């Protein structure tokens, strides 16, 4: 299963992200395309308001479609999630997973945070889905796994 089939799919991704940039201000920026990068950087700080803020900058390389970069910042209340669990989640997001899994996890974080769902409950329940490689069930809004329509009404 390929992540982004062609440039038309990239256009859909970029258009969809424009909405996320408005709806989810914690997403800092996304750029198309980007230079050849393969690393990520994570910065974690604790605030006086009993929150832990994680900043992730991740450069992904996609076959045949160029590169893109996502910068994402998210914050948890300390009472929601212990630092050890947060660290594990960050490692999971940036671990040795396929590009689409990492991409979808980053987007899903924003969606879950926006809905004020219990983040850790979602993550735990999603581990099985991800390991089972059932990405369409995991990720619904952008429908990456569907072929773009030739025409739109």
Language model features with spans:
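Catalytic cores of nucleic-acid endonucleases
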Residues: 4, 29, 57-100
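Conserved catalytic cores of phosphodiester-cleaving nucleases, focusing on short active-site segments
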Residues: 42-62
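Short glycine/proline-enriched coil/turn segments at helix->beta-strand junctions
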Residues: 23-26, 48-51, 93-95
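Non-catalytic C-terminal interaction segments of nucleic acid-processing enzymes
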Residues: 66, 94-153
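Residues that flank catalytic or metal-binding motifs in active/ligand-binding sites
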Residues: 38, 50, 85
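Acidic-basic catalytic patches of nuclease active cores, encompassing PD-(D/E)XK
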Residues: 1-36, 60-61
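Beta-rich nucleic-acid/ligand-interaction surfaces
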Residues: 35-43
């Amino acid at each position: 299963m390929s992540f982004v089939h062609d440039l038309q799919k990239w256009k859909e991704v970029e258009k969809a992200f424009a909405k996320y940039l408005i709806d989810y201000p914690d997403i800092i920026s996304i750029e198309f395309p980007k230079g050849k990068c393969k690393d990520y950087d994570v910065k974690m700080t604790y605030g006086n308001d009993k929150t832990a803020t994680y900043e992730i900058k991740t450069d992904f390389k996609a076959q045949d479609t160029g590169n893109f970069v996502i910068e994402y910042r998210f914050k948890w209340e300390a009472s929601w999630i212990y630092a050890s669990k947060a660290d594990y989640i960050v490692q999971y997001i940036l671990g040795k997973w396929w590009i689409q899994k990492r991409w979808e996890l980053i987007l899903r974080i924003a969606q879950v945070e926006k809905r004020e769902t219990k983040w850790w409950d979602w993550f735990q329940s999603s581990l099985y889905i991800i390991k089972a490689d059932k990405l369409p069930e995991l990720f619904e809004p952008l429908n990456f796994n569907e072929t773009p329509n030739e025409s739109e009404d």
